[in-house]
Every structure is written in C-alpha cells, then in structure tokens.
Amino acid sequence: VAEQAKPMFELVYFAPGRILISTTPEGNIQAIKADVELSVENKDVVIIQGNPVITAQGFDRLNKLAGVSLVMPSRIDVPGHGNQPNPFFILDPATGAIRFVMAKMVGIGYSPVGNLVIVDQSLLFDLLSYLKMDAIAKIRAVKGCGKVANKSTLSEKEKDWFFIPILDENYGICLDPLHPEFINIIKEHTQRQRFAERIALGILKRNCLRHHPAIGIMNVQLGEGGKCKVPILAWRKDLGMEELRKIAEDKSARAG
C-alpha cells in the first residue's frame, strides 16, 4: 500500500489554544500558523479616538511567533550633520537638552508565502512637537492653564507666562507657570527627554513590525471582553546575527 502524503499543516493543541505546524521530511518545524490573542486588559491594544490600535507590547507578542529580526544599522545619514552613529541626538543649543532623536531600524523576516522581506524604517523623534501637543491638549481639557494666542494680545500678567512658538516667534502656546497643570506638562516633557532613546526605538520597532508582511497589521476589531485574534504564519529559516547585520547594513546603504 502506497504511503499517504503528509499534509502541509498538522494540527497541534496546546494551552490555551491550538496551532498548525508544517515540518520538513526530517521532522523539523518549517512553519507555524496560529491565532495570537491580544487584549485591552493586557495592554496589547489601546483605544485611540474610538479605534482599537495595537501597542508596541502587542507587536512584541505577535513577533514572538512571527520571528521578524530587528537590526539597527551602525550609521545613519542626518540632514545637515552628515553620516552619524545610529541613533543620533541633536541637542537644543540654548538648554543642552535633547531636542531630536534620529534613528533607523531594519526588520528582516519572511512573508506569509516564505519570501525574505526587508523593511527599512527611519524616525525623527521631535520632543518639542510632543510638548506642544501635550500643552494644547491640556489647554483644551483644563480651564485657565493657558491659551493659544499672539503675543500682542496678551495682558501684562500673561506676558510673564511660559511661551512656546508655533507658527512664528509671535504666535504660540502660552502657559501659566503658577497653574498646577504646568508642572504636569513639564514633568511629562522631562520624562520624554530622560527616556528619549527608548521611546524613539520603541516607535521604530512598532513601525517596522506593522509594515512587515509577516505581521502587517495595525488596527483590529475587538470582540467580547476587549479581545481579538490576529492570524500569524511564521516561517522558520534561521539567519545568523552576522548575516542579519550585513543585510541591514546593505539595505541602509542602498536607502541612503
């Protein structure tokens, strides 16, 4: 009797669910297909303006199965500064604090059809822009903590307020430094400066994973209990760290 052909995927149960695996003739795992559960409770998903969005933590959970390798090229081209170490920090000349973080990351992994795909992402993390967004949000939410105005319209008292230019040096955000919320705005900004590199690389990591076809998803539909399942098909084709780094450097060099 002829031996029956082995199916492409074999069903395997494990707590708390099940996966499908494909094996080589030698019995080694070649591919894994599974539904990965994400939830709001576990902070894998957050609701932004009414839409569920996968967080960096959620992408980490998906990538444990997808297996996309994230590599930082050693150098990055920075406009006005030439070729610099990656990541690169630009300081505020007036305060010496971090003003920008510029970084590049490369995601290397296999698409659902088994092709090697390289995703190259760059980021300019502008701390002042985040400060402006925080301040405007606070002005909208808390009465009396500040205003958006032209300097020429400010009262004598308001002229002593903290001013952040927006459109030009005369029009911007005015914050009352004696208001309790002012301290919260500055505290948040200080925390971003303190952890600027970590935050920037976290954003880059999420961008690489959401653009890589091994995951390729950002928004999800939540079901009961604020949970959802994301299908992942992961190929197991080992690449050494040196090979990954060479691929990343070559991709970065071609991208400029």
Which residues make up each language-model segment?
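Glycine-rich anion-binding surface patch
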Residues: V1-I203, H211-G256
